């Protein structure tokens, strides 16, 4: 009996030691484990922050789920490792190192990355930024070095970078398909963040959506959609090509028919379409061409969300005009030479005076004679691409941004802030035409403070500018006022019905009235931006 008692006591002791070790292990790694509504995940705890790479937010949209709305995940039992980034969504990425994913490309791509402060707990209530990457709705990924959000996490903000289906897989609209699968992916990611970010230490009542380029265009669409509104309460739109407009059903259907012909399927035969490989899909997508005429600007985004009257009820710029956008604090901005990369990619040879005038007449069939004196062609024998770039920058980005900002100030109660980024980085650019220019996307490595990961060597003034930009964004995400919280060099005044103020982002930051007495934007306003804001 004594021997049996001793044995039992020893056994209990061993069990207790084992259990204690297990509890100790859980305690020591607790910061790396977060329990979501679908199961536990394990991330990485760095010295200054935590990061969870490749967190799934929907079932993989493959096989029978290709061209279907995103579907909720199935729960899992064991702790799922989220230690490495996942593939970018199906695409032929041409954005260069640090912007194209080194992991590869896959249709199984509905994942997101979460960056949090190191000390975040479920009680922290840190503000949240959800970042929607750009890339003309055809390329791009949130899981790349450019969007590394370490600096934001170190500044007490949680950042979630998302992926969504691109190109024809995300935005093919037909009589049977609404064409907003990639947009619904974004909404599914926002829903996931809203439902789960509290477990990471975030405040679901303080979620800011932010996007650049097509990501900013997406932000504008979310501001019109009743499907999105409950999942965020502030917005940042960086370099949105609002004038291009989202696709109407007719244009979307035409692009879909050309794609189906290229891939060898009837547009209504989903079995055939789903039977094609990813590479076959991408090859056929690449061959989809556009006719010129008044649709020339659609070349900027061959594939995009579709105005279906339900998920997206109207063009974002029309919603702005009618005061039908979500009334939330908003930052709107752009860079100085947005259109140069597009113009010099589309027109690789010099554009002469006659060709330039034809292009202006195509884009502005009713207003060309009013536009040409403001944007005169270069003398005969010289290249008119520089002035064409200025015109398209103003028409697609700068002037509709002005319209958006001023109209918000008149129609909405929430504050709107405007910025214009003009700093020429000391590091080079991959496109020769962008040397000594501020091209589309060039600001992002400063906005994210990811310049070292991008191999850029900035001088001290530029590093200080990056910190100042970080502080403005952190303050806005935290308080909805970019001036309250972390130190900023200049008070960024909101635009009101009586005050036009733009924050000029240069190594010496200042504010200016860039809206009043602008004859170019005044003239472009009268084109009604492709009839999106006609009186």
Curated annotation (Swiss-Prot):
Its main location: membrane. SUPFAM superfamilies: alpha/beta-Hydrolases. Keywords: cAMP, Cytoplasmic vesicle, Disulfide bond, Glycoprotein, Hydrolase, Membrane, Serine esterase, Signal. GO terms for molecular function: carboxylic ester hydrolase activity. The keyword Cytoplasm does not apply. Glycans are attached at residue 500. This is cAMP-regulated D2 protein. It comes from Dictyostelium discoideum (Social amoeba). The gene is D2.
């Amino acid at each position: 009996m004594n021997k049996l008692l001793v044995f039992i006591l020893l056994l209990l002791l061993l069990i207790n030691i084992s259990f204690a070790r297990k509890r100790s292990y859980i305690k020591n790694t607790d910061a790396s484990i977060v329990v979501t509504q679908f199961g536990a995940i394990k991330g990485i705890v760095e010295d200054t922050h935590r990061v969870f790479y490749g967190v799934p937010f929907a079932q993989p949209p493959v096989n029978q789920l290709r061209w279907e709305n995103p579907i909720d995940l199935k729960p899992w039992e064991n702790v799922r490792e989220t230690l490495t980034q996942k593939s970018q969504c199906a695409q032929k990425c041409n954005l260069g190192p640090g912007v194209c994913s080194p992991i590869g490309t896959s249709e199984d791509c509905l994942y997101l990355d979460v960056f949090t402060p190191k000390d975040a707990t479920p009680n922290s209530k840190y503000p949240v930024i959800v970042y929607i990457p750009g890339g003309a709705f055809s390329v791009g990924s949130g899981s790349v070095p450019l969007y590394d959000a370490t600096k934001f996490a170190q500044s007490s903000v949680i950042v979630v970078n998302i992926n969504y289906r691109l190109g024809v897989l995300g935005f093919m609209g037909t009589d049977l398909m609404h064409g907003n699968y990639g947009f619904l992916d974004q909404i599914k990611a926002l829903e996931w963040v809203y439902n789960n970010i509290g477990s990471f230490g975030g405040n679901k009542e303080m979620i800011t959506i932010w996007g650049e380029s097509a990501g900013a265009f997406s932000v504008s669409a979310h501001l019109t959609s009743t499907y999105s509104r409950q999942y965020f309460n502030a917005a940042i739109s960086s370099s949105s090509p609002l004038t291009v407009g989202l696709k109407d059903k007719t244009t979307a259907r035409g692009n879909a028919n050309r794609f189906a012909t290229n891939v060898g399927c009837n547009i209504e035969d989903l079995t055939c379409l789903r039977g094609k490989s990813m590479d076959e899909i991408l090859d056929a997508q690449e061959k989809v061409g556009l006719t010129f005429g008044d649709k020339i600007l659609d070349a900027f985004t061959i594939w995009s969300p579709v105005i279906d009257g339900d998920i997206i009820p109207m063009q974002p710029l029309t919603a702005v005009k009618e005061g039908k956008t979500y009334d939330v604090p908003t930052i709107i901005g752009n860079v100085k030479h947005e259109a140069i990369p597009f113009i010099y990619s589309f027109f690789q040879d010099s554009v002469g005076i006659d060709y330039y005038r034809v292009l202006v007449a195509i884009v502005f069939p009713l207003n060309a004679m009013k536009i040409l004196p403001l944007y005169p062609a270069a003398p005969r024998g010289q290249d008119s691409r520089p002035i064409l770039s200025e015109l398209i920058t103003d028409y697609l980005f700068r002037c509709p941004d002005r319209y958006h900002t001023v109209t918000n100030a008149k129609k909405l109660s929430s504050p709107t802030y405007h910025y214009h980024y003009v700093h020429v980085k000391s590091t080079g650019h991959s496109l020769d035409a962008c040397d000594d220019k501020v091209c589309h996307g060039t600001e992002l490595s400063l906005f994210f403070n990811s310049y070292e990961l991008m191999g850029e060597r900035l001088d001290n003034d530029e590093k200080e500018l990056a910190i100042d930009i970080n502080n403005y964004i952190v303050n806005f995400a935290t308080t909805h006022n970019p001036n309250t919280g972390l130190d900023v060099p200049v008070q960024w005044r909101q635009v009101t019905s009586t005050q036009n103020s733009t924050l000029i982002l240069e190594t010496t930051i200042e504010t200016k009235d860039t809206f009043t007495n602008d004859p170019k934007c005044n003239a472009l306003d009268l084109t009604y931006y492709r009839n999106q804001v006609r009186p």
